[in-house]
C-alpha cells in the first residue's frame, strides 16, 4: 500500500501518484476519521473500486477501495476524500459498497452491526462517539446484570483504560486473579470477600473486551485468556460454595448438589458448542426468544447473584440447591433449542454447507 503524506501537492494529485505507484488496489482512508476495522478488512478484499459512506454534509465520512484504473478520473485539485468520492461516483467509475455483502454479524457480540465510519471534528463529537461505540460493543444477548447494572461502573473504567493506555490483557489478568482469589475465600466461609472478588471480576469481564475493541488492540492471546476464564472458573466457584457451607463428602446433600451443578454446567457448555456448530452462530442470537431467555439463564452472573441473595437471607444451603436446579433447567432448555434449531428445523435455518 501507500500512505499519502501531507505535502505541497493537492490531495487529488498525490492520490493519483500513489495509485500509479502501487500498481494495484489501494484502501484509501482519512486519518481524521474513526473507522470500523471490519470495514478496512472488507475494503481490502474487494476486487473493484468502491466507496463506503456514512453521515451527511460536513459530517460525511468516506473510505474507498480504488484500482489504479480510476486514477485519471480523480480531480487533480480535490482537497479531501469526499470530493474524490463524489467525482468518481458522478462518472460511474466507482460503486457504493454493497451493504448486503458486508459481514455485519459479530460473533463475539452475538449481534449484527452495520459498519461505521465517523468524522471527528471536535471534543463534543468525540465524547458522543465514545458513548455510542461503548454501547455498540455490548453483546446483543447477555444477562440482566451486564445489561442493566454494570454499565455505570463499566463506562468510567473503559474511559480510564483507554485514556491512560491500559492494555485490555492487563484488565483480563486482574480479572483472572480475582476469579480464583474468590475460591479459597468462599471455601473458608469468607463469603463477603469472596463475592467482592467475584463481582469485581465480573465487572472487569465487561471492561477488557470493550477496551480491546475501542482501541483496536484485540488479540488472540487476549481472547484465549478472556474466553478461557469464562469457561473454566465456574466449577471451581461451585465446589468452593459447597465447601464453604461445610459440605466435605459425598454423604452431604450439598456436596452432591455441587457435583451435579458442575456436571450440568459442563454438559451445558457442550450442548452450546454443538448448537454453534449446527446453527453457525451462538444459540442465543438465533431468535428474539433466545435473546430474552439469555438474560436469566444459569450463567455466572445469575448463579452467583442467586447464591449471594440466599446467603443474605441465611439460606445458603437452599440457595445452592436452587442454583443446581436452575442450571439443570437451563441445560434442558438449551438441549431442546439445539435439537430444534440444529436438527429438526427447516433446512434454511441450518448453517450453510
Q: What does each model-identified segment do?
A:
Residues 1-2:
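Extended, compositionally biased accessory segments flanking or bridging domains
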Residues 58-158, 227-353:
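A feature for the membrane-embedded catalytic helix bundles of lipid/isoprenoid biosynthetic enzymes
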Residues 139-185:
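Conserved small-residue-rich
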